[in-house]
Amino acid sequence: MLDREGYRPNVGIILVNGKNEVFWGKRIREHAWQFPQGGIKYGESPVQAMYRELHEEVGLKPEHVRILGRTRDWLRYNVPDHFVRREWRGHYKGQKQIWFLLRLVGRDSDVCLRATQHPEFDAWRWSQYWVPLDAVIEFKRDVYTQALNELAVILFRRHHETRYLRQRVHGPRSTDNPSSETDGHAHIAG
């Protein structure tokens, strides 16, 4: 399902633990790390899509998390042509996403990367909040910067830590144009 401008409606998930570290998943059979994300199906709300994707990709249920916030608007990124399926070329531009900030209220052991027959990740780890900006694939970096900055205000407001907001990597702020680990442990799916 694409909108009129060629963007696929999608949700992104920033899942944090009690130390405000973020869940960072390694794409299956690739050396690419990213946040959980996925398309919104016809008739689904962004919240419904978020819970479905959370279960499909991370194995968590609604009772394992608490919603802390979400982005106000759609954040968009363009996908380079060489990543676009041949049959979509000429129509598909990229993703437009609503990002959710979730707090894990369950345990690390509740994470199950094999919750479905088609897993997205084969390993995961907790990383410091800003690490993904240095590690994510380049074409997603601006959207990650926008989402992390907007949601950091919610996450860190009690601790007055927003002074550490990261600067945008490239270009002016626009929703239309879009290292180091904390504990050294990656969690491998099994």
From Swiss-Prot:
InterPro entries to which the protein is assigned, alphabetical: Nudix_hydrolase, NUDIX_hydrolase-like_dom_sf, NUDIX_hydrolase_CS, NUDIX_hydrolase_dom, RppH
One of the Pfam families matching this protein, by short name: NUDIX
Region (Disordered): 167-190
Keyword Hydrolase set for record: yes
GO function term, MF aspect, one: pyrophosphatase activity
Family under the similarity heading: Belongs to the Nudix hydrolase family. RppH subfamily.
UniProt protein name: RNA pyrophosphohydrolase
